[in-house]
Amino acid sequence: MVTLVVDGPVAQNEICYISTGGDKLMAEVIKVVGANVYVQVFESTRGLKVGAEAEFTGHMLEVTLGPGMLSKNYDGLQNDLDKMDGVFLKRGQYTYPLDKERIWHFVPMVKAGDKVVASAWLGQVDENFQPLKIMAPFTMNGTATVKTIMPEGDYKIEDTIAILTDEEGNDIPVTMIQKWPVKRAMTNYKEKPRPFKIAGNRCTCNRYVEPDCGRWYRIYPRPLRYNGKTVLQHAISKQAEADIVIIAACGERANEVVEIFTEFPELVDPHTGRKLMERTIIIANTSNMPVAAREASVYTAMSLAEYYRSMGLKVLLMADSTSRWAQALREMSNRMEELPGPDAFPMDISAIISNFYGRAGYVKLGNDETGSITFIGTVSPAGGNLKEPVTENTKKVARCFYALEQDRADKKRYPAVNPIDSYSKYIEYPEFEEYIKEHINDEWIGKVNELKTRLQRGKEIAEQINILGDDGVPVEYHVIFWKSELIDFVILQQDAFDEVDSVTPMERQEAILNMIIDI
């Protein structure tokens, strides 16, 4: 953290650049006390001297939005990593996230004289066979009139494709590029309904039907390796009914981030037969990067997801791990000498997590189209402590909990999701019960609860057998135990590399469930 003395107005979260040794280091204002401003630098401060000058930009940390982001690898500040050379990132090196020279075929969707509001669809371009909308500026107030719109043709992202006239008569030129502060949620929608959607993973669906984009997923991996987390993430990314996939590697080890960079481009999209990377964006910040950049990465990922949601697309956002993000918040809070909460996390950690998760969801746009963000957050508590503040507050917000267990992974029972510790609060909602009755049958929730009871009973009997031996428990106990094992093998275990078993339609899941119940 660096303390600056300013001679003018400064805003909270404003971005500034500090000059040192010929480099300009990006920093963010995190606290203002009179003429003293405390900033958190996004890069190493080695060599920074007293008296160095700082230049304030007048805006918050922003992302640049537009065509050309798909299949890109970014860092937390949206620098294009593919444009950077060397093994390690150089300090003070920033790259533009989009390709200014690429040509896009623009197709208008409005005509002169039409009335539009912020984020209204003005036209469309295709990127990797994915139709993307060119929208009115998100920052526009009120209603504007389309003064001119360019005809169908080829344009660059900086070319003016439309001119809007606002209510005061001012002209607003529109290009394919937009900027948006990452810590501000996009609220350019009419409402947030609550739909549900069936997933194709048996281990999750048969315990509870997963909510679609519009709710929040939650994965909890134990802080151990080789528990099948990566394969499960790949399976969800490939099989999800999502148009766009965004991966945020927040504060993970460098070798885990390298796995993402090397393995994701090789995955084949089962829906199209093309590479999954063509509709994927990867945002990476390793654990050795400054805490401010680690915090920024999850906000950057969410802002990109909101941008695509405004186009009426389904976005899958996976963040690994939100615990590192929370630890970055703790470090900055401690440096500012704020009153610490449990485990030295900020006192408002609950509100911060709630506000961030609240940006995800299913929305109805102004033109009655729908878009959605499904957020899968990975939490890695130290020592596997489920009672630590980040895990507790995330569970309250997400209401859906996957407990990845090392013991199941050691037994090669994949996906290694513990069926006893995992749960979903959604099955308690009346609207969820109505959805199940309408789309599956009236007995589904009862059957799922019956299976979970059998699994719980089987676990208790397994502990008794381990203590007393096979001859120390009645025969009927063995029957209950092996029935629970049958449920585990047939329903909860799934081969992510098998063409048939990797994704299971709801009809097949229902048939398997009924067959097991009758045994």
Positions of the model-derived regions?
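N-terminal accessory targeting/assembly segments
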Residues: 1-90
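Structural beta-strand/beta-sheet cores of well-ordered domains, especially the beta-sheet scaffolds
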Residues: 2, 14, 25, 37, ...
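A residue-level detector for short acidic-glycine micro-motifs
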Residues: 17, 31, 41-43, 75, ...
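Short, surface-exposed secondary-structure boundary micro-motifs
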Residues: 7, 21, 59-60, 78, ...
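P-loop NTPase nucleotide-binding/switch module
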Residues: 84-127, 132-139, 144-146, 156-216, ...
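P-loop NTPase catalytic core
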Residues: 206-211, 215-519
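Short, surface-exposed secondary-structure edge patches
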Residues: 5-10, 42-48, 62, 70, ...
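Short beta-alpha junctions and helix-cap segments that line functional grooves
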Residues: 13-15, 26-28, 41, 56-60, ...
